[in-house]
Every structure is written in C-alpha cells, then in structure tokens.
C-alpha cells in the first residue's frame, strides 16, 4: 500500500539525515529532513503523523542552525512549527524545547522583549507541569534574560531558585 511505502521512505530519509548529521554534513541533513517531511505530509493527518513531523522538524532545526545561523528566520519557523505540533499532540516536553529554542533565536537577534515573553511562557509551562528539570531550564532562561536587561535583584532571585534545584 502507498501509505506504508511512504511511511517507510520517510523513515529511511530520517535515518539518512541522522547519518549526515553524524558526519557533520549539515546541508545534506537538511535536504534529507526536508524531503522526509514532505513525504510525511502526503500521508493522512493523524496525531502520530504530527508527532513524527515534530521529531523531523526538530532534527531539521538542529542541522539548519549550522548552515542558516541561530538567528535565521528559517530556523525560527521550524521551531514555531515544532511548538505548534507539540501543542496539538500534547507533548509538553517537546513544546518546552521548541519554546526554549525560540528564546535562543530571540537572544541571538538581541530581541530582549520577545526573549522575556518567551521566558515567561517557559516559566509558566515548567511551573504548571511541576517538572524540576524544566523549571531549572526556565530559571536559566529567566536569569540569562533578566541580567542583561538591568534587573540585578530579580536575576539574583532567579539564580537562587535555580541553585536550590540544582543537584550535581
């Protein structure tokens, strides 16, 4: 059946992308991941397809950062797509990572207000889930964003909260 063949071809393209990444062949990896995504999108829309696309988009983002730059519009679009798919599938951890990646794009672009907004979203997400690892990452975003914006007391408070969670 055609759908099964496409699903299998998508897996092979994903594996080719992973192999290209392992060999530092970022351009080739991007091409493989983009082809895999395009094949996947020809399959019927299901939650599983959205999950698979989120994983492929995430992998694409990693390779794309190397060739387009962390501040690129193309990379921001990939992270936005992962965030959207993660919301639709209820994958909070992947959504958190996508938001964190968007924060990183905004920091690289010196877009401090946007970085603060994304940081607030990360903090709310981490606190609502109650995951200490996510909370530590959200605090890292918070103190990294507050420090350069001239808020030393808030930065210190955020660092103290993070330090209390840190367990080497």
Which residue ranges define each predicted feature?
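Extended alpha-helical scaffolding segments used for macromolecular assembly and cargo binding
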Residues: 1-98, 105
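Extended non-membrane alpha-helical scaffolds
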Residues: 93-168
């Amino acid at each position: 059946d055609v759908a099964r063949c496409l699903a299998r071809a998508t897996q092979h393209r994903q594996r080719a992308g992973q192999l290209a990444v392992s060999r530092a062949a970022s351009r080739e990896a991007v091409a493989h991941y983009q082809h895999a995504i395009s094949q996947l999108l020809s399959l019927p829309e299901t939650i599983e397809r959205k999950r698979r696309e989120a994983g492929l988009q995430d992998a694409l983002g990693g390779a794309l950062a190397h060739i387009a730059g962390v501040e690129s519009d193309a990379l921001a679009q990939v992270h936005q797509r992962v965030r959207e798919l993660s919301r639709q599938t209820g994958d909070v951890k992947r959504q958190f990572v996508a938001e964190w990646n968007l924060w990183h794009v905004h920091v690289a672009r010196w877009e401090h207000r946007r970085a603060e907004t994304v940081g607030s979203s990360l903090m709310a997400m981490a606190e609502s889930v109650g995951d200490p690892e996510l909370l530590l990452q959200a605090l890292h975003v918070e103190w990294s964003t507050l420090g350069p914006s001239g808020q030393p007391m808030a930065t210190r408070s955020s660092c103290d909260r993070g330090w209390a969670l840190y367990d080497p």
